[in-house]
Amino acid sequence: MEELFNFFQKPKGPVKFNKVKISLASPEQIIDWSHGEVKKPETINYRTFKPERDGLFCAKVFGPVKDFECNCGKYKRMKHRGVVCEKCGVEVIQSKVRRERLGHISLAAPVAHIWFLKSLPSKIGAVLDMTLKQLEKVLYFENYAVTQSEVEELPLGTLLTEEKYRQALSEYPAQFKVGIGAEAIRELLAAQDLIGLSRVLREEMASTSSQTKRQKLGKRLFVIEAFRDSGNKPEWMILQVIPVLPPDLRPLVPLEGGRFATSDLNDLYRRVINRNNRLKRLLELDAPDIIIRNEKRMLQESVDVLFDNGRRGRVITGANKRPLKSLSDMLKGKQGRFRQNLLGKRVDYSGRSVIVVGPHLRLHQCGIPKKMALELFKPFIYNRLERKGLVTTIKSARKMVEKGAKEVWDVLEEVVTEYPVILNRAPTLHRLGMQAFEAVLIEGKAIRLHPLVCMAFNADFDGDQMAVHVPLSVEAQVEARVLMMSTNNILSPANGEPVIIPSQDIVLGLYYMTRERINVKGEGRVFSSVDEAIISYDYKETDLQAKVKVRRPEGIVDTTMGRIILGELVPKSVPFVEVNKVMSKKALAALIDYTYRHAGTKDTVILADRLKDTGYEYATRAGISICIDDMKIPATKVGLVKKGEDEVLDVEQQYSDGLITAGEKYNKVIDIWSKVSEDVANEMMDEIKTETFEDKDGNLVEGPSFNSIFVMADSGARGSRDQIRQLAGMRGLMAKPSGAIIETPIKANFREGLDVLEYFISTHGARKGLADTALKTANSGYLTRRLVDVAQEATIVEADCQTLDGIVAEPLLDGGEVLVPLGDRILGRVALEDVVDPFTGEVLVVAGEQMEEDKVAILEEAGIDRVMIRSVLTCRSKRGVCAACYGRDLGRGHLINQGEAVGVIAAQSIGEPGTQLTMRTFHIGGTASRSVEQAEIRTHRGGKVAFNNLHYVENSSGVKIVMNRNAEIFVKDEFGRDREKFKVNYGAQVLVKEGEDIERDTVLADWDAYTIPIVAEVGGIIRYGDIFNGITMQEKVDPVTGKSSMVIVHSAGGVTLNPRISVKNDRGKTLKLPDSEGFARYSLPVGSLISVEEGAEIKAGTIVGKIPRETSKTKDITGGLPRVAELFEVRKPKDPAIIARIDGKVSFGKELKGKRRVVVTPEYGEQQEYLVPKAKHIIVHEGDYVQAGEPLMEGTIVPNDILSVLGVKALAKFLVDEIQEVYRLQGVKINDKHIEVIVRQMLKRVHITRANDSKFMIGENVEWWKFEEERDRLLAEGKKPGAAEPLLLGVTKASLSTESFISAASFQETTKVLTNAAMSGRVDELLGLKENVIMGRLISAGTGINRVD
């Protein structure tokens, strides 16, 4: 009876746990888990389909095939629960135990576990101090290993070949023992004394001075201490028993025609059992040694393949030549257990369909087809039908729904009303890719989507599909409504700007209604009230675009009829000024932003919907369409193109006269055509921008044009200046697939049509665009995945970490132009110190205050240009960041809440545009857009010129030539404040005098954009040194012109030579340089051209050589994505630059073969030497003063150098600026703090340099806060703490070195991560997000933060 009651008990809840430990299994443990031994390779009987006894599917071991029914049929049904059948030995129980019961195979000979053998560095090898090759020789029966020895010449673990063994046996009979195969290795492992070994190794490490030796010992020590501390025994890496997976996890399914489909694992197990049984038989028969060895080796190989197919030897394939999936393959990769089933599951109560536009919907609604809703909400409908008493059982409810009775639809309406559903569009690149809406039932089969949320989803209606999910629990519904509702996601989490912005037709309509037209009905009328104006419009007395005056509360306003109508739509708190202008897309975005900040969410949502309706209405009324005559080709085009052709002929002539090189010719031609293309575009835009109207007095006036194409582009509805240029200007230069620009431009535009050659050239660009898109989408997705993985554990853990540290925020300048104003960089951040007005001394912002829009405006007004702000980079919170260091939650507009997953948001914000960037190339159709090289400095404001650190010589024509690198020109205002600051390149010509007053738009300096000059600082006679034709120099004769030029080349014979040009006096002595100790000797790097003849007499400031700059490639995002990935992965760039590690004066030391020696001498202390390859161009000069961190040569700076020279903050600033640069080129705005979060995660660990009394090892990498905790503990105890230096890890490395082994294993290199974790007996505390998702718990972020047990 009791049995029966047990059956009706509630099912047990899920197991509660808060940690997961992984370790090695001992043979006893495996047998303890097992429910019996699998002795035979048989699976099921092909006639009866019953499992064979003792086989791989044996019911006795794994449990019955049918619920409560033994194999022979003696016991059936519930009443015999728990009985073990005496005939067939099967326990009568539910068949689902076949999913959880393990079996085992007892091996006749031990085998090595391949993970611990082959996963580098080999764990078995580390314990025994043997190489992988040596181990394999023993394991695969080639060599003997000494397992016991009393002879000094034969220490334990010595390898002996067959003849060496015989020889040793005759020399030392009965004094040693050898073994072979896994048995020998097991014996050696069991004999290791881990505690003694680790002590010896630590002593060795302390005493050795060689870096490589220390690293080697450190690796070995790590493994040994892992075994010592985890309680795992090294001999467990050799298997004596193999567990067998439960049969329902490796099913065997009968197909029609008497065949079977089976899991590969069954084949693999079968091979192991066959070989094991054969080995047992051979051992019983006392077979010859050689046969037994062969069989043991085959057993070892079959177990290797079962665990990890293809790790050693060739991949074992099945009948259809497909590699068999081993146990490791089940875990690995995108299709493995982690990523396929644990991190990404399919969910019930979901559907997908095509989307169409729903212009009548409100912002919080979406249309769901009735048929779909009926299926999604079935259980709710059954419940409602029962409650209403329309049906009595679930079965009858189901029938009623299937019949489609009238009541069912009414019930469906009730269920769906105000029920939030979640819509998702793949690819979900950021959190706005999943939003909640209230469902509205519609006829038809397509989901209807509100047009304004398309931008967030990146959706359009050309056949996109979306998925619908139903949140079931009350909590899920609340979260969907409060957090995910589209009305609560007005701002983008990436940059805090609205994502719900009108686009396309809506913009066109609103733009059209707010434009003014000259001389239309009702112009000049004055209305006493808004109502009167609108009545006048309704009676068609006044035109929509008529200029009128109207009386409003703030006074009489000049406006137009359309703007009055629009003004009625905005909330009361938004002043009329905000809409009393032409509403382009930018203006509408600003209006929505203003409304959100001043009127709140609700009003913004209402406004957005009203704008949508009005926009559509007036776009329809406007009836804008385009025709071919709207594309006006400028009359001046022919002349401009002709002029371009003449200039190109001129350049060709210079080239054939040998005045310029092929590279210079190419660059000049490209520049000419870029310029012509621009000029034609400007002429064309001028032509369509304005048209002539007749005003009411009959005079002709110019006004903004109503040309349809111009209207579309100007409003921001569709099309760009570039596209119009191609339609009506000239198509311009195109790029080859390699990225190089083709010299011949396309002179025609699309209205005129392309000829065959032009068409052929354009196919290049177009095709490259499409190919790139496909490739780069994948790369961008991979970048996002790496970023999410590194940042997933960064959440907001506390309100304030009380740190006193922060970073400096400054506006971002480029050549005197403000690219990013200070306001953009500090908005929503928390001030670290009081911000004081430099003139009045008034405190504008108090320390610890969040800087909102109003404060930022005050700071910008006061002209403040640097503020100390809190930053996640300096946050002291452990395992996360604090709210004060993070600042504003950009997607919500207030200080961030605790528990917010800022890491994931940061990763999405950086990764999402990555894919957009990749898709950018494609719209302009591959026309080459390359900025004409900036070769001059122009002022943006007037003022007084001041030089800073500018050394120059005057050349023969009296122009100042800049002779040093960090020269700057300032423009100061009347108060003497610096208004603009420009860096001036070495070799530039300065065209103004110090102290001169200048107007705006004055050219201060210019230089050659294509070459870097080498300038003589003194006059005299030129002499060559080490310039030998055919060795260090080559005369290159141009095939076209027959002219020769001298180019310095790299050659094996000239390694020790240093090609140079010296300036000497008439007595043949090299002249000294004025104001420095050096001489007028100029080294020529490889690739430079010599510009002066030997023996020529020159004046100071003459160019003696030139180094050509790279021929320009088109600026495609290819520079972008790979560059971003390179920075985040901290890869060594292709041509790294050497940087100065100290401040000091530069001099050149004695040359080393092939390298030049740059010496930096500080005022006090040691001088430092740097060796630079001769082929590289050194950009510092004798006597220059350099600062630490400045590059000494051309090339890309290596992030790790910045970290070691200038520290963490400088590195972070470098990374943020470099990454932002790539995105800014593409016009993508990302807030700095997102990049800072990722950089913080990359800098999470420190590298132990001295261990002293701490528990760490030299060379170990640990979290900074663990190191600090240990340091504080040791100092408190009066002991000596270790020392550490900050460590910068690339995002992949950082993800793999995370605390959580579950998270790391699900990212990459699964087997390696699990092997290391098992060996160390790692415990996963389940603190991050990913590991909790995998374990099926609530994540420790957001609403789950207080719920985690």
From Swiss-Prot:
Catalytic activity, EC: 2.7.7.6
GO biological process: DNA-templated transcription
Residues the record lists as binding Zn(2+) 1: 70, 72, 85, 88
Record field: catalytic activity: RNA(n) + a ribonucleoside 5'-triphosphate = RNA(n+1) + diphosphate
Binding site for Zn(2+) 2: 801, 875, 882, 885
Recorded superkingdom: Bacteria
Listed transmembrane segments: none
Amino-acid positions noted as binding Mg(2+) in the UniProt annotation, renumbered to this chain: 460, 462, 464
Pfam families in UniProt: RNA_pol_Rpb1_1, RNA_pol_Rpb1_2, RNA_pol_Rpb1_3, RNA_pol_Rpb1_4, RNA_pol_Rpb1_5
SUPFAM superfamilies, per the entry: beta and beta-prime subunits of DNA dependent RNA-polymerase (SSF64484)
InterPro entries the record matches: DNA-dir_RpoC_beta_prime, DNA-dir_RpoC_beta_prime_bact, RNA_pol_asu, RNA_pol_N, RNA_pol_Rpb1_1, RNA_pol_Rpb1_3, RNA_pol_Rpb1_3_sf, RNA_pol_Rpb1_4
Subunit and interaction comment: The RNAP catalytic core consists of 2 alpha, 1 beta, 1 beta' and 1 omega subunit. When a sigma factor is associated with the core the holoenzyme is formed, which can initiate transcription.
Name this polypeptide is given: DNA-directed RNA polymerase subunit beta'
Species this protein is from: Desulfotalea psychrophila (strain LSv54 / DSM 12343)
